[in-house]
């Protein structure tokens, strides 16, 4: 039952994508997963217009990942840097930076909660590639654009005994 429900959510999210990328809509807010998976450039090319808000919590998370030497952090920071060249959107950095305890408990959803709070305060559509974040935001009554990330195929190695 859960698996079917999950697939229905993904199909519905894709079907409604063109309705949610509305030129009349003013504010969009992104989470870390959308930045790392390089979805923003694609959305802008599909017609995303208006104000794109990048929470300071997302920037802090990307900086933290980059400082730890993780590729996702560097990828995310490069993507944000590239967004400055698009004239179709107005880029804005907003919201509180997370505290040490919020960073420590990021896996339990502390940073996601900061992003949802900012989306509520700015009346923004949340753009995410995290299914849990999307469902939580919908439960709070936020409008969400969920974009499924491509899964990397695992390389399989076979050893043959001769």
Where are these regions (language model features)?
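Short glycine- and acidic-rich boundary segments immediately preceding or forming the N-terminal edge
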Residues: 1-16
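Active-site-proximal, substrate-binding regions of enzyme catalytic domains
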Residues: 15-127, 131-140, 145-146, 151
């Amino acid at each position: 039952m859960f698996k079917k429900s999950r697939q229905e959510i993904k199909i519905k999210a894709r079907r409604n994508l063109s309705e949610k990328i509305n030129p009349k809509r003013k504010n969009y807010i992104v989470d870390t997963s959308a930045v790392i998976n390089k979805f923003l450039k694609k959305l802008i090319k599909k017609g995303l217009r208006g104000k794109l808000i990048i929470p300071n919590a997302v920037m802090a998370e990307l900086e933290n990942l980059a400082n730890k030497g993780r590729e996702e952090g560097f990828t995310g920071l490069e993507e944000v840097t590239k967004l400055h060249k698009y004239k179709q959107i107005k880029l804005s950095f907003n919201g509180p930076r997370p505290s040490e305890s919020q960073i420590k408990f990021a896996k339990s959803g502390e940073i996601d909660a900061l992003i949802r709070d900012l989306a509520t305060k700015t009346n923004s559509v949340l753009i995410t590639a995290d299914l849990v974040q999307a469902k939580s935001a919908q439960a709070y009554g936020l409008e969400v654009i969920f974009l499924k990330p491509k899964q990397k195929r695992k390389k399989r190695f076979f050893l043959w005994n001769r």
